[in-house]
């Protein structure tokens, strides 16, 4: 799929995240997601609604692979960043700037990573979906917007979705929430 066809929507933060430092989201704003990790409660509801729809449509598994694919504390983001980037220049390496210093990716085979405090994972509104290729990716492309998710970096990270709907619960998520109340 051509990257120009990928939906990239501007993020509207949930109101309860205003003033929260990235990577320091209070536990009461986070909710567990299956099978690993936590997301901001609005993003978690949207993720679970999307996951249930994916399952109903035969897209299995549909999940983050590890806790690092959801909310990341500042300490965790820093640890991963230091594993992937170094201060010593590397010819041809992609770079990130963190705290006014240029950092170089250690290997082109490593996935890129936002500098600590700048990732949507640090706010609990990003989720990385395992194996986002083929039918799974096509399903995501056709359905992610209905659940309030959009891409951020394409085509480098087809697995990386972020919740963009803020406090405006998408209709597909509200329908899922309503069905949960009836059951």
Q: Model regions: which residues?
A:
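Cell-envelope/glycan interface and biosynthesis
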Residues: 1-183
């Amino acid at each position: 799929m051509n990257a120009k066809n990928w939906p990239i929507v501007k993020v509207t933060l949930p109101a309860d995240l205003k003033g929260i430092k990235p990577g320091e989201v209070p536990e009461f704003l986070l909710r567990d997601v299956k099978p690993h990790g936590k997301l901001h409660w609005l993003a978690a509801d949207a993720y679970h609604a999307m996951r249930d729809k994916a399952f109903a449509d035969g897209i299995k598994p549909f999940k983050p692979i590890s806790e690092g694919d959801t909310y990341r504390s500042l300490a965790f983001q820093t640890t991963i960043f230091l594993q992937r980037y170094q201060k010593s220049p590397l010819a041809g390496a992609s770079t990130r700037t963190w705290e006014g210093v240029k950092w170089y990716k250690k290997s082109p085979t490593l996935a890129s990573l936002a500098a600590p405090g700048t990732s949507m994972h640090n706010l609990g509104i990003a989720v990385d979906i395992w194996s986002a290729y083929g039918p799974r990716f096509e399903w995501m492309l056709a359905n992610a917007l209905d659940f309030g998710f959009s891409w951020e970096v394409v085509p480098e990270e087809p697995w990386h979705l972020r919740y963009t709907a803020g406090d405006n619960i998408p209709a597909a998520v509200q329908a899922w929430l309503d069905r949960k109340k009836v059951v």
